């Protein structure tokens, strides 16, 4: 322990080594070298320092050798060159192809796969434990079954979707934006403007004062020189010190010159690196010209602008101008621009550097264009050389002298009672005339012994410049003169105020040597003693510094030292504002808190403490420019934003922490870094210059002189320390045929090759570039939108699944600060975490992104009720960020509309905005490939840890909702996150969201398939898998004889191993992975279609596929939530912030059910969400409210148990309204059947209307007076749906909707003779149970259908209706309700004679568990339907509404026996009069119910067909033979709980959240082999 303490002390003392090592490491990281070896012999302690620094900076370090030969080596990433990685990859690929049994990749294209960034080729090692099984939920299987029956896989699925055959779009398409066009101004208009300006100058006193102040700026005397240089040269560089006035005056000089001298209109574009600068400067210039913003001067920043074409001067950010140059095309954007001013080029942001490269290439072909570069640092020569030696106009700054102290001096100041360090801050400037006077006084004193003048000057100046001034001719100083002349008192005085006794004259002698030469022994002795004291003091200062450095960490800001220094300044001086430079918001908050806790600064009348940060509202930021009242000192705590972007003119004292938060990118490890780093010398100079605005100032640099000497000259250019994926895309848009790497080498400082390679991989992953690096139409569209390319893809996907609003929120939030604030006290932190969890729980919890979406929705609702401030306070949310997000979302939506991506009315674009499954999928698209999986828990770990694709282990941030996912059910859960950040606290991920597996399979880059151990007879489940690190690049199935993968896909139920992105293994059935592949292809095809044709409908097969994808995502989320739902304790006091009522339900599932028994459990939860502030559910929920009827949300999963008492209350529950696949709004089932709406589908792009295909030709519904529901409870009447003629059914099975579980049987009905349909299968519509009503499918528009309100009716009049080809279906006399409970009988209909229906299979419900049987039904002959693609069993005609067929059978409540009702007369197919069908009863029995077989009938008279079975029987209902008298009632069987029901929730069957119109078959598995193209 003692040794460790000694080493630590030594490490802290050796600051010189730390400063030197920091410089070496930073230079190495900025270089293009892959390795570096220290040639110096380092001690163990020094090597320890460097090893620790390397870990922080993401570098690898290793020591080799022994003794004097021991050397320390540094490496970037894994130390393996890219060429070696490529050879390793090819060798591994060849090995895999030759004999490891891996089938080739399911991807048809060659992807350039991202390799492990910190370990070369990833050696995927599958855990010996069983693979995680992945399967579609039963409801999703039914949807997929319907999809692939109607639109089976074919070659057209991949046509146009392969990245290799994308067509390059017109990258120079016209973008109609006249903001950068030259104003329409005649010479007369220009003269009027000049006269108006002159008139105001004469008449308005305020305007004259402004003009006079402008004329006193340092740059005013250089006006003519600047104008002349601009007229004579195409490029001019103005190097002006901060405060000279270049930013505000140069644009006005150019404007006035064009108007006054040339009488010409002009368009002057001025770029700024920051939004705040562009807006504030344009506002300042407008004020100086006596105008309002938006007239002569305007601005345009991202999603915000003032002014337009008539603005002659436009301020914008660098990114805006860059987008204009690229987006509009170089041939159409430049001619209207006369001048481009690029300000603050020394900041070297990536957009600025890239734009300068483009402009340099444009200048030769645009001789009219003038480019003015402006910089505030000494790096002007380099920029001049970059533009071929352009002229430089140097403008001095208008600042007073500033004295600088370093940490060594500051510590001495704090230990001293004197205030001599403040003397220079109260004296006037040392000017040229003072220098002339001193020259004369020194000459007179030395030659004529006239000392009075020199003594007076030195005393009056009182500055170090005067004390140490050297004569311009002789080099003598006042101290030398007084020492050589023996003036002891003057020598003592000069030495006491800091005169330097080490200076030498031009003859090379010091004051001491001159005194000895002149035999002035007394003064010589005084100087000799003083020099000894200085050395002693210097040693004391060094000792003091060493002791201080031993107690702190140099990389951390010492807030306590800053407070002590401010107290010292305020005690020794009376006025002058103090500006403190700090790295970030955390340090600002800590400093402010410490100041307020100190009694010295607690008096608000004496001190005003202000913060200058991007998180601070604009109104608060403006206060820093106001001068405080007399007797009050202003203290400003700021980041580097105060270096050059803003100027505070009353600052006298500057405290520089020497640190700055800088975001950078490590391309070798593919990790972003946000660390506090040391400033550059240029930054330090800028900060010191802030102190000399109004008088002489002082700057305290809180780092040593040794550290100051080791600082880099300038900051590393942003293009070298940030990802360049956006720049690479812009390069391809500018020149589609160029090589990106070669193009970027033209930059002043090009990025490293590894960074460019990483960017190209991302662009290929999202489809913006082909594998050959060609620009795709998808990439062209991504580049036009004002968001990151990944965000662009997320927006397009969100539009396709009707989930736009959350996507806009997430897109805008990606570039903003976290809306959730971080309280300082532990108690408040716990409350903030609970509040965030409560918001996220509205969408299933375990997501930081969904918490942001919920917070924004709740805030908008609270804002509408005037409670936004209270809501933000109680939920620890930044109202500033919320307002900002609201503004950005509105503007981004306008931009999308302007680009034609969405229609002007986008109210229907967010019908699925509250579906958790679809929301998580949208997040996955926007964040991919930032994917990881949760590591299993360990005893010593308290925080969640994520494993990335590179094999790195990163932590979840402390404020994340997923920080403490301690349950083992989250082991290996998949996580998507914003980015990996290496900070001072370690390597963490940013905001993250837990994902189900199916979205990952859908959106991943590639999926590879191999056999599982269970398929191999040699291996067991417990054996380790073979390596899957590198698989083939084609998605073809290996069919060579003898190969292990020969029969992978031949059996649909065979289990296969699927490896996602070459590192995530899962176990899936061969049939389901085949379906997944087709869905992937159709998803990409849908996005491409939407990009090319944003205002057109998707083709039918793509529309149906997007609907199916949305349904799968929704059902999968419901299945996941039923397993992983975690109760969140509500914050009662917080809830009141948005809803002061007392009836707000808790988030506890049981309480939700008790709150409203008539809603689905998730419906109650969404009701809670609505009351908490989720806005108008009628506008956003996928299921709509029709005619004022309330309706529970069908898009959510039941998550609570439904008690028997609750079920009894639901005798007649509200039916659900659902959108069908083909955009038909089925309306409310119980009421209001008159007006049927056609709404945009939840799966198709907004604005596309698509109606249901007609299933019957010339359907005539006849005059139907009463159409009661198809499934009636409590004795309600019911009619039979129409059949359709000439329908191509394809290979359709008859799928009943209910699920038979726990040993339920369904016996085979007897077949009818001579029945042959050609393997045709029929799908029976699903029904509503538990007293839910279902209206007739063919009900006429406007007809009242209130059968549910007539439980006492026994009989109703028969109705005559027509079916396909005007066929009379005869009379149906008796129609029993479809859902009969408690041993009600029901018979089957007789089949008609001579109908050739072929082999038609009747499939039992979707999930047949425990030996459920599946039977075959033969239907009458001579009615050949052919292959029908449209398999929807429910028809809509003449505006008839259709009940929701996706409603699953629920547990029936106890109901009284129902009497028989008269059935209706209906027509069948092919002109056959089916006669009187007496009894129509349900077709399916659930929970142990038996169904008897119908007797076979030969050549039955179609005139009297009896009993057509609509749907279901539940809860012990029997079904007798359809062709005999009702059978004897069997004993009532005890109902069993279905296996597939959630054991915790014990609820109704889950409903889809995408308005799913699914078939009754829930299995989703086609019994035949999957129809997959041979090339798949």
From Swiss-Prot:
What compartments host this protein? Nucleus
InterPro entries for the chain: Ankyrin_rpt-contain_sf, DEAD-box_helicase_OB_fold, DEAD/DEAH_box_helicase_dom, HA2_WH, Helicase-assoc_dom, Helicase_ATP-bd, Helicase_C-like, P-loop_NTPase
What is a single molecular function from GO for this protein? DNA helicase activity
Q: Where is each Helicase ATP-binding domain found? A: 227-396
Entry keyword set: ATP-binding, DNA-binding, Helicase, Hydrolase, Nucleotide-binding, Nucleus, Repeat, RNA-binding
Where is the sequence biased in composition, kind Basic residues?
Answer: 1352-1363, 1455-1467, 1528-1537
Give me any GO biological process, just one. DNA metabolic process
Q: Which residues form the R3H domain?
A: 15-78
Q: Name one GO cellular component term.
A: nucleus
* Ranges of Basic and acidic residues composition bias in the record: 1305-1319, 1490-1508
Motif range (Nuclear localization signal):
1530-1537
- Where is the motif (DEIH box)? 343-346
- In residue numbers, the region (Disordered) covers 1137-1165, 1177-1223, 1260-1576
Feature: compositional bias, Polar residues: 1281-1301, 1381-1412, 1509-1524, 1540-1562
The Helicase C-terminal domain sits at 561-735
- Spell out the Pfam families in the cross-references: DEAD, HA2_C, HA2_N, Helicase_C, OB_NTP_bind, R3H
- So what EC number does this one have? 3.6.4.13, 3.6.4.12
Q: Where does ATP bind?
A: 240-247
User: Where is the motif PH1 annotated in this sequence?
Assistant: 1349-1360
Q: What does this protein do?
A: May function as an ATP-dependent RNA/DNA helicase. Binds DNA in vitro in a non-specific manner.
Q: Per the entry's comment, what about the domains?
A: PH (probe helix) motif serves as a DNA recognition helix.
* Protein name as annotated: DExH-box ATP-dependent RNA helicase DExH2
